[in-house]
Amino acid sequence: MRSKRKPIAIAILVVIAWFGVTGFFGPLFGKLTSVQENDNSAFLPDSAESTKAVKLLESFAAGESTAFPTLVLLEGSVGPEVLQQINAHLETVPDLKLGGTDVPLSKYLLPGSRVTAFPAADGKAVLASILLDGAAIAEVLPNDEPVLPAIVEALREDFTPFAKDLGFDSYVTGAGGLIGDLFGAFGDLDSTLLLTTLGVVAFILIIVYRSPILWFLPLLSAVFALSTAGGIIYLLAKNDVIDVNGQSQGILSVLVLGAGTDYALLLISRYREELHHHSTPVAAMRAAYKGTFEPIVASGATVALGLLVLLLSDLSGNRGLGPIGAIGVAVAVITMVTLLPAFLVLFGRWIFWPRIPRFDDVDAQLTGTWAKVGNLVERRPRRAWIITGLLLVVLAGFSTTLKTDGLSSSESFTGNPESVVGQKLLLNHFPGGEGDPTKVILKNELIPAVSEKLRGVEGVTAVAPEANAAGVIVKDGLSILNVTLSTAPDSRESRDRIPAIRDAVKSVDESILVGGTTAVFFDTDVAARHDNRTVIPVVLLLITLILGLLLRSIVSAVLLLGTVVLSYFATLGVCALVFNHIFGFAGADASFPLFAFIFLVALGIDYNIFLMTRVREESGKMGTRKGVIKGLMVTGSVITSAGIVLAATFGVLGILPLVFLAELGFAVAFGVLLDTIIVRSILVPALVHEIGPKVWWPSKLSKSAD
């Protein structure tokens, strides 16, 4: 009797321990937004020229800070009297209160700066440049809300009625407006994204299990995992160990809930199968645990290690996602191999009601749809892998048309927030770079020579040294040239001019630095392309080693990796067609191929690990060719369900008004479905059946009779 009670007692202790852990970390997860860093310049390595420029620019500003321009565009007929009214109103801007607090906007203005307006040459618009303190706006308000979106909201609430009274339209735009709207989009992560993801997962689990009760246990376990991982990440970010931005927080939520639910599905499926062969839930769980622990841990390790390779990235945002995702996946694995088994053992067989698996019942997994698929592959394996392989190759051919040369801030939104509309209207009245010029830091005596060189660069509309009432500002023998471009500072056209600007100034003096918003965007694209070249080969090597060790076979490791990489390029091909011709996106971020690769290859390998570990187990009993068909039959339903869950969770990213996350969500959702329905269900089993026992070379299994 005591031996029977011991597993139950252990299960109770595990559940109590998890409630304690989540009770501590859960509330901290709610604060994760307050430690986000969404400024592009903060993501660049110290070696980037624009980063060096930022550090030098800080020494020019009073209070050791950098100017962060926020623009207010007022459209209407401008006369002397109206301009006077606008300037008078601008004097009240420093007194605006932020985010429902008593904190005035003046606290975040660049010391010594004045808020003034100047009219457009066409007399149809006025532009006010509000210079914010770049260091101060990185703080949070007393209510833990980020400062910048609160400033943007306060300016809009103030200027909208004022402009209306004048018969004008107002738009808060520029770097401050665009990033403020970016923060606003990420602000939905805590509520809209999380609740939608939970709802989607719950809906799919109810359909999969056809039980009014069972779905709750894996979902609750996944929520415990997310809360715990989020709390750990908050503590690390608060202590400056890792960088968190809105994208990485959103990806964390869908990754933990999606991957965690996948692992839960695998365990529950095997547990249900074993309940047909064991008289007690404890005995069934022991057998299920033995059969699923290795593939779950191996799958989690593959994803986590693949994400950790992002630590090799130049971009700190990518480096931050590495440990963030790895922590999330690791906690998800730990939760699903500890908390979920404890829940299942405590609730017993009845948790599967109304489809309760009975001892000695026939397991339905060996009949039905997946038995038919298995029989089809078994009858004509060569035709199966040739047709599916050719389909993937054709789709992969379109991957060369995917545009990954980066997005401007205005192209980064799926809709048209006020900052994007304002940025477009700004170009009708002012040079695109007005209010946010490219910064050239140089020795004071070189100003005439460098200015002459810059005026000869295509797209440069104005060159002027930074000055105050006393004249040109000089700090330690250095000055700043403000270079105004004809196009928006974050546009591809402006970015493409940075090399020419740098070549022009360095022809005078190699020590001259070019910085500012446009240079930051250009250097970010360069760093992203470096990350693509560096990280992807390392991930491929790492995954090959993990597969080889897990399956004890070089042939199967290379085979699986090859099919998943082919699936990745096929997905990129479909993305190119959809993004260009259906969604109408301007392109994709330079980091998109890397993010898509990390998730598609690492998560795609997951399903092949689930399949092939079971195939190896069955091959030892009945031979490779029969074993692969049996493995496909018994894992088909659960792996497809897992793929649907993961696709749905990443697809939820599409509800956010951000092009990068919408594109990533589509890519992962489509790629995972392609992998589960085509690659893992037909291509891999057909190839294994064709190759036979040699697929396990050099292990002993390769020499067994088939």
Give the location of each predicted region.
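Structured non-transmembrane domains adjacent to transmembrane bundles in polytopic membrane proteins
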Residues: 37, 46-67, 76-176, 401-587, ...
